[in-house]
Each structure stands twice: as structure tokens, then as C-alpha cells.
From Swiss-Prot:
HAMAP family according to UniProt: ArgD_aminotrans_3, AstC_aminotrans_3
Protein's UniProt name: Succinylornithine transaminase
Cofactor(s) listed: pyridoxal 5'-phosphate
Gene transcribed to yield this protein: astC
Entry's EC annotation: 2.6.1.81
Organism classification: Bacteria, Pseudomonadati, Pseudomonadota, Gammaproteobacteria, Enterobacterales
């Protein structure tokens, strides 16, 4: 077999559309929560592919599931169903409030499906009906949210920097203030078909919703016959210490979207809902070529089986505390964080005023010492590691973070 051509980081700049600015090294191998680059340098992975690699890299059971299915059938298309997709659907239904599942390839697709479902349900059940004043097609979302990059979902996300260059944007979307129920109450009316919210705003700064806020949204949606959609793309599949974050709050959505960790690194997305709302969609009303792909569903079924275990979920909560304790010690030495927040293994370290705007600089400095981490805006350093990362890897990774922080501190104070 012909040897592949050598590639470098410069190859990215020459050949790839410049929608990303990746690190200056190329990862070639991963095992557990450790990665290696082309030069053999090792990195502790606190990013997890942005909350995707929930079981780390190269988990033997996940790899075995992929290989086993690859020996059977890879793809069929939606004219035929397959065993892995049916088994995965049943797993999700048994584990959540849902009764029906729509499979797709990504979080953006899952959110797109959820928003289309909401408008279709409202059209079928309320448009031109007695007592309905005006059309019922308005969507309420929240500032600093992130719901994907399609034109519809990027419009729902309340971050103009991602949408302002693509006008005209889809209409009928209104943005309230996250965790401000009075703000939401002003926007949610009988013309509202859906409210979409993240239980924890991930890209928006790792900001958890207040329990009262989500319960209030539930009540407002019930009052105005609007669907409550929980975007659990980042918080789902064990990330917060429950299978889905809504389980922390004691409030169930009408629709839930899931992706990222669901495939453990293999692309897959899902929209979960009840029979009542799923009935709004009929054959041909929505679809996606690769949705329910046998390879993706076989992998996701194994990932879900491994994660949806009491011991593993309890371990996520324990690891959260390990992180918090070590981060508090780092902050006692360097005084860079104003707040450490999040749930489970979705953690955000908010920089104080002296270090405002330096999250990317800290992450880049930490990478020099062998740590891969994330940002959530200019003022938040974010961690979303494997749910089974070892205590040793946590301690070593945070030691490398501390070295990166010290490097930035020296620049700031010199």
C-alpha cells in the first residue's frame, strides 16, 4: 500500500477553508486521556474534542463495536431500517422521558429538527383554530446561547458574532436574558411555538441555568402551549453526572437534542420527543441521508451502555470535586479566577478583571506544557474531559495548566 504523503500544520493553511485556526501541532494518536503529536510530544486531554470523547480515546469496547459493525453493513439509507438504530432508539427511550427518536449527524441538525418540529406542531394544532390570535410560529431563545451553525440554528443562538454576516436571517426568533424569568415572560406569548434553552450555556461561558428559571420556563410553555426544547448537545450523555442535565432539575422538556458525546467521537445526533409531538412529522416531512447510520448507531449504543451506569455517573460527580479542589489550590497561588462553575465534567474557570480577555492565551501557554483545554469566550477557560479520566491524569493535567498560568501571570505582572 502506498505511503501517505507527509503533511504539516502549514498544509492546513494551504488546503483547508479557513473557518478554524487549529493549534500549531498535529495530533496523530490518542489513548485514554493522553494524546501524542507528530513529534511524539504527549498532551493530557481536558478538551475531549469539545465534550465529545466521553470515554477518552481508543476505548476498547467502543473500538470493538465499530469493527464488529464494519464487518456487517455500513450504510443503507432511509428506505431500510437496521438493527443498531432500533436498539439505540430503545435505549434512549428507556433512559429518558422520550417515546420517539429522530437520528441525524450533529447537534446543529438535531436542533434544526427540533425547531422545525415545533413550528409544524403549532401549524397543525393551533393555526386558524378558534381562540388562537394570529400565527403561532415565534421562537424564544436566549442571549449568548449556541445551538449550531445552520442558518436557522445560528439565528437561534444569541451570539451576533456568529450570525451577523449571513443576513437576511430567518425571522420569528426572539432572545431573552438567560436566567431572567421576567425577561422570558415578556417574550413568551400565545404566538410562541417553542422555547429553546441550554441547561448549561456551554459556548456562552459554562453558565448553569437556575432551577427556578427552568421550572418557570416549563410553566410558561404550558400556559402558552409552546414546546420546551432542551439543547443538551454539550450537557448530555453523562457530562454533568446525570445521563442528561434535565434530570438534575426535576423538569422534563418536550423535546431534547443530543449529539457530541452520544457517539463518543463518531458523528451522530438525535432529537428525542414524545409520541404526541412526533406525530406532527410525517413521511417525507423531514430527513437526512446518514441519519440512523448503522456504524454510528452501533458505536453510540455501546457508548450509552457504558455511560448510563450508576458507578460511572457517580464517578463524574467525584471527578468534578477533584477538579474544583485542585483548581482552588492553583487559584490560591496565582489569583486568576473570579469564579469556578459548571456541573460534573463541564467546568468553566472565569478569569478575574486583571486577566480579562486572556483565556486563549492561558490555553495556548498550557499547550506548551502539554495540556489541551478549551475556552468559552475571552474570559473563561473550559474543561470537558473524558468522563473516566484518571485521578493521575487530572493531577498531571492541572499541574501543566498551572505552569501555563504562571507563564501568563509573569507577563501580566512584569
Amino acid at each position: 500500500m502506498e505511503q501517505p504523503s507527509p503533511v504539516t500544520r502549514q498544509s492546513f493553511d494551504e488546503w483547508i477553508v479557513p473557518t478554524y485556526a487549529p493549534a500549531d501541532f498535529i495530533v496523530v494518536r490518542g489513548e485514554g486521556s493522553t494524546l501524542w503529536d507528530q513529534q511524539g510530544k504527549s498532551y493530557i486531554d481536558f478538551a475531549g474534542g469539545i465534550a465529545v470523547n466521553a470515554l477518552g480515546h481508543g476505548h476498547p469496547a467502543v473500538r470493538a463495536a465499530l469493527i464488529e459493525q464494519a464487518d456487517k453493513v455500513w450504510h443503507l439509507g432511509n428506505g431500510y431500517t437496521n438493527e443498531p438504530v432500533l436498539r439505540l432508539a430503545k435505549q434512549l427511550i428507556d433512559a429518558t422521558f422520550a417515546e420517539k427518536v429522530f437520528f441525524c449527524n450533529s447537534g446543529a441538525e438535531a436542533n434544526e429538527a427540533a425547531l422545525k418540529l415545533a413550528r409544524k406542531y403549532a401549524l397543525d394544532n393551533f393555526a386558524n383554530k378558534a381562540g388562537q390570535q394570529g400565527e403561532k410560529n415565534q421562537i424564544v431563545a436566549f442571549r449568548n446561547a449556541f445551538h449550531g451553525r445552520t442558518l436557522f440554528t445560528v439565528s437561534a443562538g444569541g451570539q451576533p458574532k456568529y450570525s451577523q454576516d449571513f443576513a437576511p436571517l430567518p425571522g420569528g426568533i426572539h432572545h431573552g436574558i438567560f436566567n431572567d424569568l421576567a425577561s422570558a415572560e415578556q417574550l413568551i406569548t400565545d404566538q410562541t411555538c417553542a422555547v429553546i434553552v441550554e441547561p448549561i450555556q456551554g459556548e456562552g461561558g459554562v453558565l448553569p441555568a437556575d432551577k427556578e428559571f427552568l421550572h418557570g420556563l416549563r410553566a410558561l410553555c404550558d400556559r402558552h402551549n409552546a414546546l420546551l426544547i432542551f439543547d443538551e448537545i454539550q450537557t448530555g450523555v453523562g457530562r454533568t453526572g446525570e445521563l442528561y442535565a434535565y434530570m438534575h432539575y426535576g423538569v422534563s422538556p418536550d423535546v431534547l437534542t443530543s449529539a457530541k458525546a452520544l457517539g463518543g467521537g463518531f458523528p451522530i445526533g438525535a432529537m428525542l420527543t414524545t409520541t404526541k409531538y412526533a406525530s406532527a412529522l410525517s413521511v417525507g416531512s423531514h430527513g437526512t441521508t446518514f441519519g440512523g447510520n448503522p456504524l454510528a448507531c452501533a458505536v453510540a449504543g455501546t457508548v450509552l451502555s457504558l455511560i448510563n451506569q450508576p458507578t460511572l455517573l457517580a464517578g463524574v460527580k467525584a471527578r468534578h470535586q477533584w477538579f474544583i479542589d485542585e483548581l482552588a489550590e492553583i487559584n490560591a497561588r496565582h489569583n486568576v479566577f473570579a469564579e469556578i462553575r459548571g456541573r460534573g465534567l463541564l467546568i468553566g474557570c472565569v478569569l478575574n478583571a486583571q486577566y480579562a480577555g486572556k483565556s486563549k492565551e492561558i490555553v495556548q501557554a498550557a499547550a506548551q506544557y502539554g495540556l489541551i483545554a478549551l475556552i468559552a469566550g475571552p474570559d473563561v477557560v473550559r474543561f470537558a474531559p473524558s468522563l473516566i479520566i484518571s485521578p493521575k491524569e487530572i493531577k498531571e493535567g492541572l499541574a501543566r495548566l498551572a505552569m501555563g498560568i504562571e507563564q501568563v501571570c509573569q507577563k501580566v505582572t512584569s
